[in-house]
Amino acid sequence: MRRTTIAALSLAALTSVAATAPARAEMSLSFYGGPQTAPHSRVKGDDGDGTEFNFLSEWEGKSFEAPPHYGVRGVWWRDENLGFGVDFNHVKVYASDDTREDNGFENLELTDGLNILTANVFYRWPGQFAGGALTPYVSGGLGIAVPHVDVEINDSETFGYQVTGPAVAWIAGVSYDLNDRWAVFGEYKGTFSSNEADLDNGGELKTDIVTNALNVGLTLKF
C-alpha cells in the first residue's frame, strides 16, 4: 500500500510539472537503470530495549536483484538550456553478512527502495557533438528519502515505509537523439540521504547514505 502511495505521489509530482508548463515548452519523460553501489557508512541507534549500537556498515547494492534499481523523471525545459523537473530513484542498500553477524542484526536493509524523491534543476548544452545529436547535461536536486525499512535486532522487528530525512542528488550525463521524439542517454548519478528511522520497539536507527550509479535510459520528448 505504501509503495503504491509513493508511486502515486511521484506520478502526481511529474503530472504537476507538466500541468504548469506553457504550451510551447519542451517536456520530457525518462526511465533509467543501471549498476548502483554505496560506500560504507556509520549506523547508530538503539533497539528500544536498552541495547545501543554504533558501527561502520558495509553496504551492498544488488542492483539487478528484485526489486531492481531504477528511476523515472519528468523535466520541463523552459528554454534550450534550462529545465526544472522531478526525479524518483529506487536505490537500495543491504548490510553485508559480516556487518549483520558482527553487530547482532538479523536484517538490516533499505531495499524495497531507499526511494529518493527530488526536485531538480537541469542545465544542458544542446547538440554539442556528433553532428548535433549529442547533448551533455548536469543536474542537482533537493528532496526526501522514503525508504522501506527492514531491520531486525533482538526483539525489535521493523518492516515498512518511513520518511527518514532530507536527500540531495547530482547528475552528469549525455543524451543522444534518435529522432525528434526519442533519445537515449548515459549518466552518472549520486545521492546523499540523512536517515533517521523509528524502530518498532521504540528504538531508532540513524545513518547517512551515499549512492553512486551509472545509468542508461530512454527519454520521450513531447
Please report, for each region that a protein language model flagged, where it lies by residue.
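Gram-negative (and chloroplast) outer-membrane scaffold detector with strong preference
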Residues: V75-I153, L214-K221
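Short glycine/proline- and aromatic-enriched beta-strand/turn motifs that initiate or cap beta-hairpins
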Residues: A23-W76, V149, N215-K221
